[in-house]
Amino acid sequence: MVTKWKKICLFDNYEISNTGKIRNSKSGKLLKFSMRKGYYCCSLSKNNTKKTFNVHRLVARIFINNPSKFNVVNHKDGNKLNNNSSNLEWTNYKHNANHAITNGLKKIFRKKIHQYDINGNYIDSFESINNAGLYTGINPKHISSTCLGKRKTCGGFIWEYDKKFSKEKKNGLPLENNNNYLITKDGRVFSKRANKYLKPKIDPDGYLLVSISTNNVNKQISIHRLVAMTYIENPNNYPYVNHIDNNKQNNNITNLEWCTPKQNMIHHIKTRTKIYTVKVAQYDMNYNVITSYASIKEAGEKTGIDKSSIVRVCKGKQKYAGKYIWSYIN
């Protein structure tokens, strides 16, 4: 895909690319993104006023037609950090939710529950809290609170989760020095107090975090380290945990390994070398195609232009290299 830049409407001091980068249109300097609910976001300034936008919505608004006037932007591959225009689509809330479920991005837990009278006599069972609410007319949120032990009764009844469900949910091993949490081999963290799996957050470096409370003090901890400390032996006391496939959100034990700082750096360098084997196109200053190369290494050798400079242009971190425009070819 050829990288294209366009002005951002109402904020013409900025340009956005179809690969999800934003830069100052005058200096060419790329903006740094922060994280908001798992999405990249950035602040744009105009007349001394700042406004924060989700990057994927800006890309969609500028590069993707929306004839049906949908108000939701969907990431096709489920990766919220992949804001390439080819990975985005306008949709509605229903399709967005179905997409998440179909692709395993969101799981539906049908928590079977049982209804009892005040004396503990069995009345009925329901496949889910929502079904119980529809049948009895009782607020599902209140039923949920009763099942979680936050209230004794709801609507004049006692409610409990099915015991089989509870056993299935509470799998995994306890965290080191904190038995209130369980961690599974695939990186899910279960809170015994809340009786549910914790929803992870994504830090600025792309790692998944959860908030762990110890002695009433909350601390954000990387999930990959929790998995490694619980399941993977570390006889040499190595300080780093490496993602073997370089996917920072794949926290399965089969994808993690303890390593030294040097080993971690070597792995990082090896994965970066893949960048130099991607096909690249060369353009003049008017975006006319000059030629293409099988790799950035070849482009650098034949043109005499620094390879890292070509990479920076392809990534949108600078405008030109050797008075040429460059872009990756997918």
Swiss-Prot record:
Q: Does the keyword Oxidoreductase apply?
A: no
Q: Which domain of life is it from?
A: Viruses
SUPFAM superfamilies recorded: DNA-binding domain of intron-encoded endonucleases, His-Me finger endonucleases
- Annotated keywords: Endonuclease, Hydrolase, Nuclease
| EC number(s) on file | 3.1.-.-
Query: InterPro entries attached here?
Result: His-Me_finger_sf, HNH_nuc, Intron_nuc_1_rpt, NUMOD1, NUMOD4, WH-like_DNA-bd_sf
Keyword Ligase attached: no
* GO molecular function terms listed in the Swiss-Prot or TrEMBL record: endonuclease activity
User: In this record, what's one Pfam family?
Assistant: HNH_3
Protein name, please?
Uncharacterized HNH endonuclease L245
> What organism is listed for this UniProt entry?
Acanthamoeba polyphaga mimivirus (APMV)
